[in-house]
Amino acid sequence: MIKKYYESDADLAAVQGKQIAVIGYGSQGRGQALNLRDSGLSVIIGLRPGRSFQQASEDGFEVFPVADAVKKADIIQILLPDESQGAVYKTEIRPYLADKKCLMFSHGFNIHYGQIVPPPNVDVVMVAPKGPGHMVRRTFEEGKGVPALIAIEQDYTGDAQAIALGYAKGIGATRAVVFETTFREETETDLFGEQAVLCGGVTSLIKAGFETLVDAGYAPEMAYLEVLHEMKLIVDMIYEGGFTNMRDSISNTALYGDLTRGPRVIGEDSRIAMEEILEEIQNGEFAREWMLENIVNRPVFTALKRNDEEHLLEEVGAEIRGLMPQFKKNA
């Protein structure tokens, strides 16, 4: 069974008196930094010039160039995009990693795939909230927390686990639960979840359902409402109580269709495709492909993203959301 930690298992003392540098100030960086500060910890921000620099300053943080922040810090939490971390680490972090510093991540991609290879005389840990930065912040302000993962890749000082748990407590994660994992397990399961289910799987399923109805002559608006708009209602019920809760809340007609037709949509061919996707993650093929895509300025990424943004589904969705007061700001 996976090991779990709660408030009583973590001690802020492990990170008190240490200078924490959060490198990056996007959604996750901002949420974590604000929570850490509100927990009484010393936090500075390391950034390259840009809009985030102004935001961090307005939030009351001392903001430094990345290299200067690393020099000042005992704990360096790297919260930059995966594709940017390697280059920034090489030029602005690695030269200033002094003995016994702690290098921290919220995703294992760069460590697991060797884009970042830390020296042996530092701790290397992960604290990965299982929610976006704004949720990390909001739940903290409500006196609750978002669950998180911790992993220890390198324990040079002997204090790596205590530091990871102390940091997790500082962002509010131990108010919920903290699970212990490894960099490998977190990276591979996270990528698989994104690609096969949460992002790639869901969007492809919705798009295929929408196109099937429209191609059969049904109004695009009806297709949108049936395959996308109602998705949140179903997902919320699953989130709150699993499949059983959702199935107890729908009609018997819907449930019979679920049980008898669902496996025809996601059947053996889909399972085979999922296994292939997982293998590409495990053997590093996906990581190499994504790194190469960035080296050549993302031509495939840009084209595919543009195609989906111009899809009829997006046009109809914007129109329908514009008719609903609660969605107008997102239309």
Swiss-Prot record:
Mg(2+) 2 binds at D190, E226, E230. Pfam families: KARI_C, KARI_N. Keywords: Amino-acid biosynthesis, Branched-chain amino acid biosynthesis, Magnesium, Metal-binding, NADP, Oxidoreductase. Gene3D superfamilies: 6.10.240.10, NAD(P)-binding Rossmann-like Domain. Binds 2 magnesium ions per subunit. Its EC number is 1.1.1.86. PANTHER family: KETOL-ACID REDUCTOISOMERASE, MITOCHONDRIAL (PTHR21371:SF1). This is Ketol-acid reductoisomerase (NADP(+)). It comes from Methanosphaerula palustris (strain ATCC BAA-1556 / DSM 19958 / E1-9c).
